[in-house]
Amino acid sequence: MNIFYFSECPITSAKAQPDKMLVKMPLETAQMLCTAHRIVGSEDYCNKHDLYKKAYWNHPCTVWARECSANYLWLYAHFLALGNEYKFRYGREHASITKLKMPLVRLPANIKLSYKRTPVAQAMPHEYKNDDPIKAYRDYCTH
């Protein structure tokens, strides 16, 4: 479970995903977005749209996703971009995109509204973390 944050732009960040990460990232991202709905959203909405069950709800990236609407919306845009990149590379739509792109477009009902994102979680060994999360993730993924 992680958000490989290679760029401030969710599209550029998705395009930078290595193949071995890209195959699993639409699912992991969907799990984080669904967990946001399960924790700060409506259980009725989750059940009506058959959202994934809560997963790794205390993971730093999953917590980050539900901290505020700006975080959630960035991650949702990244989710769509991951899906587009997956389709470009593999010629088919990822199952998580097919199932969840429409229900996840809606913000969780009780998420804190904000136009500004909080600092992205750096879920990696301490030696790679620094003030620049883009550099931290690039260093982490190349070592």
Regions from the PLM with identified roles:
Residues 58, 97-98, 123-125:
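Intrinsic disorder and flexible coil segments
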